Amino acid sequence: EAIERELPSFLRSYFVYLKGNVLPMSRLAYLQDVRFFFDYLISNTSLTDADVPKDIKLEEIRDITSMDVNLFIDFCRKYTVDDGDKLIIYENNNKTLARKKSSVSVMFKQLYRDGFVDNNITDGFDPIKVPKPGEREIKALQDDEVMVMLDAVTTGSNMTPHERKYWEKTKLRDKAILMLFLTYGLRLSELQQLNISSFNFSRGEFTIYRKRGKESSMPINQSVQMTIQDYINNERSSINEETEVDEDALFLSLQGRRMTSRSIRELVKKYTAI
């Protein structure tokens, strides 16, 4: 919240979006990246007359182009900071650059959705290649990779037209799976066995079915609860109307059947590879 006070007030809905859609461990990194972007605008461009990020005007943001953001990402590859006594050189790999791009992309997409800017300039952002996981494993994720993955499942970024067409039908389900996977570290079998009845939203908890039939109760945080309820109310319910379904299973295929552990594994692998 301290960083939020250092940024312009027109980003208020962006802050709200982050609280509702991004894991707490990643939200701070988003805000730090956006603040760094604004510091860059002040110190390295003529795009603003402000002396501090908070004073940057919405009119100045409206004039920013995709080329300006691409130049910022290129700047982030290697830059020098004067700390008073010495010059410090910073270098970032493609994974970190992809995270910074994701942070700025989400900000501009939110400004566009709010009607604060006329164009969605993120379509013109240059792609950044990042190493993909091996064919069989689900890799451990760093914070910056988590951010890229959650941005992809939330906005459909970095997808092929075919992937995006399928994502439109399952984006709320996919996000709910990833939020549970990332927040609680659930096994694929535990995700697969979750039911709607596993969740007691009024008490703020849910039940996990462990090996050998053991059950464990877990507290559910606000971001995860909102994501799951959004999926149940707005996406899963439409599947229920179109075909016979496993009525209590939480995660359904488009055919209305409980997803298998294998299909959940492939889903997680797909998003870790984006």
Write out the residue ranges for each language-model feature:
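Conserved catalytic core of the tyrosine transesterase superfamily
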Residues: 1-274
